[in-house]
Every structure is written in C-alpha cells, then in structure tokens.
C-alpha cells in the first residue's frame, strides 16, 4: 500500500507543481493544514451534545460519560501508532484515516439518532473512531506544517496547535445557528450529518496538502530521484521513512530523559485537564462566577499563549533555551492552581505546555521522527486527566467546601514536574544541547 500511496502523492505534487510555483505550493499546503486544524475539534464539542443525548435519546449520564471516555481513548492511546505511521509513510496516510473514520462514524451516529436508537455500544464505537479520526487529521496537519517550515519549529508547531484550540470556539458558535436546533435543543441528526460531509471535504484537501510534504522529505533526506525513475520503484519499502527511523526511535524509548520529560508532562497536564473538565464544579464551590464566560476566558488565554509562545520560542532560542520558557509556563500554572479560580493563568499555562513541549521534543530527538516521539508523549494527557480528575472527584464528594487540599496537591505536583524538567535539561546540556 505504501508504494501506491507514495505514487498517488507524488502524482498530485507533480501535477500541482506545473500549475503553482513550489514556494506558493508550500504556502497553500500550510494554509490548508491550518484550516484542517481549525475544523478538527468537533469532538471537543461533546459537552454540547449532552442535553440532547439525555433529553431526546434518554441516555443516562453514566452512559453519556462512557461514550465520552471511549472518545478520549480513541484520541490519545492511538497517537503513538499514528505518529510512527506518519513518520514511516507520510502524513498523507493519516489524512486518509481521518476520512475513513470520520465520515462513516458521523453518518452512523446520524442514523442512530434518526431512528431514536439508544444503542450505547453503537455510539461508543463511533465516538472512539471519531477520536481516532480527530487525532489523525490533527497530527497530519501538525506534521505537515512542521516539515514545510523546519527552520521555524516554534511557529510551525504553535500555529496549527492554536488553530486546533480555536476550533472549539468556532464550532460552538456555528452550532448556535437555528439550522442545527429543534425545540430549543441541538438536532443531533443534522449536526452529525453536517460533520460527516464537512470532514469528507476537509479530509480530501488535507490529503492533497500533506502530499506536498514529499518534496520536503526528499530534500531533507537527500532523495533526488531521476525523472525517468519509475515512481513505484523509488524505494522498496517505506518511501518516506526517515534515515535510521527504527534505531532512532528505539534510542528515544531507551533515553532516560524522554521518560523524565514524560513524567513531567503527566504531572503538568493532568491538573490542567482536570481543571478544565471540572471548571463548573470548581466555580460552584468557590466564587460562583459565570461558567460560559470563564470557559471563554480560558480558551482565549490558551489560544493566545500558544501563538505568542510559538513566535517567542523561535526568536529567543538563540539567546534563551526553550526549557526556561517551559519553567515560566509551569510557574504560571502553579500560580493558577493556587488562585483556584484564575481561568486566565490556567489557560495560559495549558496552552503554553502544548506549544513548548512538542517544540522541545522536535529539537532534541529530531523533527523528522516527531510523529513517533511526540505521539508517544500523548499518553500523558490521558493518564494525567484520569489521575487528577479522579482525585478531584473524590475530594469534592467528601468535602465540597474544602477544595484547597486538592489545589495544594496539584500545585505541588506541578512544582515536582518543574524539577523533572530541569533534570532532563541537565542530561541534554551534558550532550551539548545548551540552547534550542
């Protein structure tokens, strides 16, 4: 299959190159990838479906949370495999995955709603595939951007991450349109059908844009095939696999600094995910601030931090190591946890982590195997979210008016994570990575 995929991708690139100059083609591919990220976050709108699931389809909240949990598993636990496939066969394969899993899943969901089916298993399977498709489209776009602009890793990584962060805000506004509502609740049949057709179009566009990365891969790996060489004979196996991919990935897995950094990410992102998931309960038991406003503030702060830190990390990397930017982001997060209700500080820290961490990973282990390396790190949000959310739930159930113990614990965990980051940096410094 890899030969045929490479052949199709190379044909698309060759045809487009006759119509558009290479530099302009790269710009178009970059913009399409950003657009893909901008609409990739439909799964982040799951909370908007809850009332329709409960009131229209009669699902219990336990059943609804089972569906949500399966979507998270689909998103996070498949990322290491998706990353390895992207490095081996190119991000175009992930774009195809997004079409294969998004469209049938949303169409089946639409059908289940139209028949008033309460099939929890059906919804669980579909949303698990939707989570997988979300990661496929997002990762394909992220890797495409990173490979098109390898000299500006911070900006190339922060822009798609920023667009993905905005996708929830954009989707929430779109779903306010009367077209998507019936009897003052979301018409899930219409919503799911809309997303199925949307992702068919976006998936095809993403496949075209990610095919252009082949040009960058050939230049990066020194592959300059003769025009008369048959495209299907360019390579006998993985046509886009970086040099020594398997050995480098094994070295990454055996690298103590990788595990140290992973632990730090779990201790960092766990409190942030838990805060975001339980913001309604936190506000209820503290200052009672307006939930929609606080959600908007956190989302805007996170998005702004992703974009700002992406630019800042690129232009300051010659003078200041990105590790110190990460330390600042962690300190901001500690302050946010100690304040308990500061959506701004927690949003800045949350967005900053998802910008600085992948940039550091790309700098230390190489941008050409970033799919495998950063994909492996994506188990951290799943583990961290479960650990700290369960801890919050137990604390809130036992003593709803004394959440200070929870926040002291999360702040302490983030301080410990900062120590782990510095330990990893000490290892990198000894290897010669003084500024990156």
UniProtKB/Swiss-Prot annotation:
CDD domains: MFS_Mch1p_like (cd17354). SUPFAM superfamilies: MFS general substrate transporter. It is a multi-pass membrane protein. The keyword Glycoprotein applies. GO terms for molecular function: transmembrane transporter activity. It is found in: Vacuole membrane. This is Probable transporter MCH1.
